[in-house]
């Protein structure tokens, strides 16, 4: 699982470029924040939020929901705070 799979899904769905850009920004922050973290399986941690985001994209949910999925463990598992996410992405995504 990598971001290209999610991005290709979004493109195939003809999502607006600004929606894809929002999701890319969320992925970039999540990828950086979770750098070096592993799942119990040994896989990179980012696989979990990516898989969640892909499932939501396949369900045709909106860009804010997909971005929130990518970021959903950032506040729990990294030094980033909810206030950090709120500043970067707004209240709709950082809830």
Model-assigned labels for residue ranges:
Residues 1-95:
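Active-site helical microenvironments for divalent-metal-assisted chemistry
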